[in-house]
Amino acid sequence: MSGLKIVVIGGGSSYTPELIEGLLNRYHEMPVASLWLVDIEEGKEKVEIIAGLARRMIAKAGLTIEVVATLDRESALRDADFVCSQFRAGCLDARISDERISLKYGLIGQETNGLGGFANACRTIPIALEIAADMERLCPDAWLLNFTNPSGMVTEAILRHSRIKAVGLCNVPVIMQKGITTLLQCADEKEVVMQVAGLNHFIFVRQILHKGKEWLPEVIAEINAGRDPLVPRNIPPFRWPSHLLQGLGMIPCAYLRYYYMKDDLLRQELAEAGGEGTRGEVVKQLEKILFDQYRDPHLAVKPKALEGRGGQYYSEAACELMNAIYNDKRIIMHVNTRNNGAINGLPDDCAVEVSSLITASGPLPLNVAPFPEDTLRLLQLMKSFERLTIEAALTGNRHTAWRA
């Protein structure tokens, strides 16, 4: 069997070295013949820098993988096996603009929540569907792994408006799993079974099993005591009100602070915008540092500075998912896929982020116990926002946008 052809849309992203590292670590199970890094004219220099680093990393590993950097998406997609989507429509300047406009009007300016998430989705979804249409023609059997934000809305748009095989990914469940493993003082995170359910950046940990025992109450107690390693680097680590977690009986992901602790987060964002800058401005400076390192002809590993990006572990999750599909691993991962009844009270055709069994045929979402009514209403409200946003992005209808 010949090796795999893997295509990365947004190949000039600073995250790509983590993806390459993950592919190299799994080469014995998932042999890659060629890696195509696709970008646009504005990203031409970055994608060439990434391609150079990729070749050095591959050589250091003693492997032979063709690396192609290109602006020609069509030639890249032809006969691909897996396509990873990690592009940012409008680049970081658009994100910064979203943040600044939101804060100007006293609103949270986060790239996947509220006004910022809406604007990002409207820019991104039409491009994502263009890519999906290209895949229908050029690689109809390929899997699309989407971690372009807002991942849940982008994934749902693709699932509902194209015929390709697609799965959405997020690093938040990965970070939560690693954090819970730390709290349980467990050496191997694979021994910890975590069930999550909800929407992208709106998930709840519903169950934690280790060696046959339920540990959710103990982990909640640890978090309430001030030990919370479940927070990504890009989210302010405000302490949850203890009554909230006790009342929920679940662990909300860090992004739910934007809803349960909105006023605190808004004050923090306003203070940061007046000081070191918005998150987008901070990331822009970090990317300059990263690409200065990536240019170094002696660098042949993923630099530690990459851990400063909030999306740490996105690429790790992507490689694990590719491996699970390719080898029919039948492992549990937490992905964005069609609901199909997994969460009662949400449409069957909508995208949800749930624990799923990953097979060669894709993810099989695991049914979850009914949510408490108050939490379900929040999920339904957010899903209505997402579906109206998708409709507005595809139709350009201003009235639909206002409804969202």
Question: Can you say where each PLM-predicted feature lies in the sequence?
Answer:
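N-terminal Rossmann-like dinucleotide-binding module
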Residues: 5-31, 35-38
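Rossmann-fold dinucleotide-binding core
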Residues: 17, 143, 147-212
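Conserved N-terminal glycine/acidic-rich loop preference
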Residues: 2-15, 43-47, 127, 154-169
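Long, compositionally biased stretches enriched for glycine and/or charged residues
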Residues: 188-404
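Redox-cofactor binding/interface segments in oxidoreductases and associated redox assembly factors
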Residues: 78, 84-85, 146
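Short acidic low-complexity segments
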Residues: 66-79
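Glycine-rich phosphate-binding loop and adjoining beta1-alpha1-beta2 segment
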Residues: 28-62
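Rossmann-fold NAD(P)-binding glycine/threonine-rich loop
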Residues: 93-160
